């Protein structure tokens, strides 16, 4: 599943190519992935123009001129593929990114007034697109459970420490993976941030000092910003909004580097399981807090 930097990269690409396009038709073949009434589609989607695309956690939100919006979650195998004067593929890459469309994985087709089209493809049918009033987005159950955006300038270290300490008996990795604590951080960036802050992934959240949590707070921000600059990662073969693979993993310090040398101390990177997830860390740099 794409994490915050990958979805942010897709958002930026969609904003570059879709703004002010008018939707003239919508077709879909999987009602569970597009659970919207024909009446709402005809009244609030068809004929609307795209105002902007934004991100909340790991979801995309496309705002429309009708004051409705499309909330999109790509899940594991979702794609957004644009075909027009320019082309791009965003999401899980397979032949659908470059081959003829629609194909057997196409679930939704948006056609615009300039004859360009946006395809939502999803092989495993876990992703979805919901049409709803803008004012109701924040009331979605999963949206209400989301924690702060890590890169929001209004999110400060003291709030971060408070949120972490409310889960004092959980491992620090489980804590920062919890979307109610932080929105958008997943396995890759949890491992990288903990390495940067020199914190063992299985350390209990309640054992970490203010100084350590402040360092982790800044490390999460730095890691996410760096990944966005590099177009995200290629975990699960994720690609960005122009069909280019993100290059973050080429610069990763621990993620998927088990058996290799730590770039900071030269020790061997190990892989263990923490919070049911494969976890990469340096045993010398990241000693467990007692």
What do these predicted regions represent?
Residues 1-4, 100, 150, 154, ...:
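Generic detection of long, well-ordered alpha-helical segments
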Residues 1-4, 35, 39, 70, ...:
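Low-complexity, intrinsically disordered regions enriched in charged/polar residues
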Residues 1-121, 126-127, 261, 277-290:
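A cross-family signal for N-terminal binding/gating loops and helix N-caps
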Residues 22-41, 54, 159-290:
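Basic, nucleic-acid-binding surfaces and adjacent catalytic neighborhoods in DNA/RNA-processing proteins
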Residues 45, 143-146, 238, 255:
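Short clusters of hydrophobic/aromatic residues that line enzyme substrate/ligand-binding pockets
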Residues 70-183, 189-196, 204:
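Phosphate/anion-contacting hairpin/loop surfaces
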């Amino acid at each position: 599943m794409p994490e915050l930097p990958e979805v942010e990269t897709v958002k930026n690409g969609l904003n570059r190519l879709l703004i002010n396009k008018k939707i003239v038709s919508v077709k879909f073949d999987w009602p569970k992935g597009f659970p919207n009434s024909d009446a709402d589609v005809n009244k609030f989607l068809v004929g609307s123009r795209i105002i902007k695309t934004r991100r909340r956690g790991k979801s995309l939100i496309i705002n429309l001129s009708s004051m409705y919006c499309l909330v999109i979650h790509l899940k594991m195998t979702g794609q957004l593929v644009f075909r027009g004067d320019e082309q791009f593929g965003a999401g899980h890459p397979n032949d659908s990114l470059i081959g003829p469309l629609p194909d057997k994985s196409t679930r939704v087709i948006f056609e615009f007034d300039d004859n360009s089209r946006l395809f939502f493809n999803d092989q495993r049918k876990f992703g979805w697109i919901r049409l709803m009033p803008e004012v109701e987005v924040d009331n979605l159950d999963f949206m209400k459970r989301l924690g702060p955006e890590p890169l929001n300038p209004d999110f400060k270290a003291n709030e971060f420490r408070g949120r972490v300490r409310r889960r004092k008996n959980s491992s620090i990795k489980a804590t920062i993976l919890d979307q109610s604590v932080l929105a958008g951080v997943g396995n890759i960036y949890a491992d990288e941030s903990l390495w940067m802050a020199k914190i063992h992934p299985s350390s209990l959240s309640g054992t970490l000092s203010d100084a350590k949590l402040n360092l982790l707070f800044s490390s999460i921000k730095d890691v996410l910003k760096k990944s966005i600059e590099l177009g995200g990662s290629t975990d699960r073969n994720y690609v960005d909004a122009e069909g280019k693979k993100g290059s973050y993993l080429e610069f990763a310090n621990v993620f998927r580097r088990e058996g290799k040398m730590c770039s900071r101390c030269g020790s061997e990177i190990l892989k263990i399981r923490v919070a049911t997830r494969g976890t990469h860390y340096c045993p010398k740099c990241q000693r467990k807090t007692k």
